[in-house]
């Protein structure tokens, strides 16, 4: 099982390439999958984690409209990616557009995946002023600190 953690600020070059932080490279592997993520970011999965996630999507009932829409969101946006010898990967133009990425991005390790955010969206979505309320709702889900 993969274990990504940490926060890294990077830039996308003129060709749409991003340097993957060295801490993530070995865990991510040479080939991986990038797709649309929730909250306007991108999700990056190592191949084995993607296969596990994809397997869970396959179990959703086809007759359920929300299940079809949820699966379509992740599967239609998915792109196989590779890392070059310099640790760079190309972020497909459609995914850059979805995540409103221009130049500055933030990569975050989220245990089983990496999230890539435009710097602006990261700041907008991740103010921690409501952390007490979030912690209370996590306790309702069975997670307590």
Where are the model-predicted features located?
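Flexible "stalk/tail and boundary" regions
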Residues: 1-10, 14, 24-81, 85, ...
């Amino acid at each position: 099982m993969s274990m990504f953690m940490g926060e890294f600020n990077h830039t996308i070059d003129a060709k749409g390439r991003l340097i993957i932080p060295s801490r993530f490279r070995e865990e991510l592997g040479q080939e991986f999958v990038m797709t649309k993520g929730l909250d306007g970011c991108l999700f990056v999965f190592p191949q084995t984690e993607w296969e596990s996630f994809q397997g869970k999507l396959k179990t959703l009932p086809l007759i359920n409209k929300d299940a079809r829409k949820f699966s379509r969101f992740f599967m239609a946006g998915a792109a196989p990616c590779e890392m070059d010898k310099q640790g760079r990967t190309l972020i497909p133009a459609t995914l850059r557009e979805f995540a409103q990425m221009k130049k500055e991005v933030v990569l975050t390790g989220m245990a089983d995946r990496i999230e890539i955010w435009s710097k602006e969206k990261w700041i907008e979505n991740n103010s921690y002023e409501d952390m007490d309320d979030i912690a209370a709702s996590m306790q309702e889900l069975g997670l307590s600190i």
